Swiss-Prot record:
HAMAP family: RNA_methyltransf_FlpA. The gene is Fbll1. This is RNA 2'-O-methyltransferase FBLL1. It is found in: Nucleus, Nucleolus. The modification Omega-N-methylarginine is found at residue 7. The keyword Hydrolase does not apply. It is an enzyme of class 2 (transferase).
Length: 314
């Protein structure tokens, strides 16, 4: 028995195969002609059930970029939420990708091009800013598991080495409108960016001075609860100590980011960190915690401690 339809005889198998080819754009079930004849503009074979015709439809779909059966499939919705971190004022965003975030003090405004996310909470929209640990030593320390940062809502913070205000802006979010962050930066170029950030954030007070000379800006700054230092200078322990003696209350806390190469490029990072800790201890700055910042920063460590701790009660 010869196939019906002469050259289009690959449609043997009836109309079922041809119609499948036309619907799905593949024509694989019983419609071999749908792929070979149809995709080359065929349809000349008339098969017993119109297999060749179904093939023509399949060829069309392929030219438009593939099977059409997934064309209108909707993407599954992703549930997003924000959870409080154990550090007060810091949050974790749960979505397509998890991220460290802070509640944006100035909704609708980003500081350094960071992503902003909006979440409905109790019927109100709340905007959060993602905090990049590759651009912030404090964020890297938090994700690295630091036990305490001592920066929380209503805190007064002295930030040494504020640069253009990337981390300062997140500290501003954490402490809220009732807190204050004094941001000290010596570079005038970075200082201009810092001032622009402070124009929209009323809890940031920019101080364009050298952190080595705290007496030059002592009239601008009151006593603070926390000092954060990211100055990357060979004498940074001395810089922190001078500012602590001038502005940090007894029992206050400090966080210092240490970049080993900036202090001694010939010694190992561990030796540099140990040396800096000894210098801090000589200045009534008692280190309580130390952690490295890998994988976010290489040869960096953050030391957290207390200044002139009160005597332990017996």
């Amino acid at each position: 028995m010869k196939p019906a339809g002469g050259r289009g005889g690959w449609g043997w198998g009836g109309g079922k195969g041809g119609s499948k080819g036309g619907d799905t754009g593949s024509g694989t079930k019983g419609g071999f002609g749908a792929r070979t004849r149809g995709s080359s503009g065929g349809g000349r074979g008339r098969g017993r059930g119109g297999g060749g015709g179904g093939g023509g439809g399949g060829g069309d779909r392929q030219r438009r970029g593939g099977p059409g059966k997934n064309k209108n499939r909707r993407k599954k919705g992703i549930t997003v939420s924000v959870e409080p971190h154990r550090h007060e004022g810091v949050f974790i965003y749960r979505g397509a990708e998890d991220a460290l975030v802070t509640l944006n003090m100035v909704p609708g405004v980003s500081v350094y091009g960071e992503k902003r996310v909006t979440v409905m909470e109790n019927g109100e929209k709340q905007e959060y800013r993602t905090w990049n640990p590759f651009r912030s030593k404090l964020a890297a320390a938090i994700l690295g598991g630091v036990d305490q940062i001592h920066i929380k809502p209503k805190s007064k913070v002295l930030y040494l080495g504020a640069a253009s205000g990337t981390t300062v802006s997140h500290v501003s979010d954490i402490i809220g409108p009732d807190g204050l962050v004094y941001a000290v930066e010596f570079s005038h170029r970075a200082g201009r960016d810092l001032v622009n950030v402070a124009k929209k954030r009323t809890n940031i007070i920019p101080v364009l001075e050298d952190a080595r000379h705290p007496l030059k800006y002592r009239m601008l700054i009151g006593m603070v609860d926390v000092i954060f230092a990211d100055v990357a200078q060979p004498d940074q322990s001395r810089i922190v100590a001078l500012n602590a003696h001038t502005f940090l209350r007894n029992g206050g806390h400090f966080l210092i980011s240490i970049k080993a190469n900036c202090i001694d490029s010939t010694a190992s990072a561990e030796a540099v960190f140990a040396s800096e800790v000894r210098k801090l201890q000589q200045e009534n700055l008692k280190p309580q915690e130390q952690l490295t910042l890998e994988p976010y920063e290489r040869d960096h460590a953050v030391v957290v401690g207390v200044y002139r701790p009160p005597p332990k009660s017996k």
